[in-house]
C-alpha cells in the first residue's frame, strides 16, 4: 500500500497489495489484493508487449487476485517461493524481502513455510534452498559500463546500462 512516505521495511507499516514474479519462462505473474478487470489486464499485456518490443522479447501477463493480504503472502511463500531456486531483484534484500518477512510476522505467517524443509537462514530469513542475488548490490560494486552514476534508482540504471526504463503504470493498486 502506498502512502506519502517511503515505508521502513523493518517496521512494514502498510499492507503488501501486489507482488510481481518474473519467471525464466518469460511470464510476469502478478499477485494482488485488488481485482483487475479483463480490459485492464489486456492493457497491461499491451504495455508489456510494447515495452519489450525494442529488444525482441515477449512476456506473458498472468494475474491472480486474492481476498486479502494474508492469503496473498501465504500463497507467495508456500506455493511460489518454495519452488524457486533463485530470488533476485533491485534492492530486493534490503527492502522487498525484509518488508515481506516483517509483514508476514505481523500477520502470523511463519516465513519458514517458504522452505521445503521449513528452515530459513541468516538475519534476512531466506529459505534454505534458495540462492539470493540483489542486482543493486552487484551494480553498485561491479558495474563498469557507467562512469558517473547519477543515482542508484532502477529507472536511471536501466536507462543508462541497457536503454530500458521501468514500465509506467498509470493506475493504482490500492
Show which residues each predicted segment covers.
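Short polybasic amphipathic segments
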Residues: 19-21, 51-52
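Short beta-strand elements in bilobed, periplasmic/extracellular small-molecule ligand-binding domains
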Residues: 31, 49-60, 166-173
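A generic structural motif
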Residues: 22-24, 159
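Flexible loop/turn segments at secondary-structure boundaries
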Residues: 3-6, 28, 94-98
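Entry/capping segment at the start of metal-dependent catalytic domains
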Residues: 1-20
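Short, solvent-exposed beta-strand-terminating loops
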Residues: 26-42
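Conserved DEDDh/DEDDy metal-dependent 3′-5′ exonuclease domain
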Residues: 37-149, 156
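C-terminal or mid-to-C-terminal helical accessory/interaction module adjacent to the motor/catalytic core
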Residues: 149-174
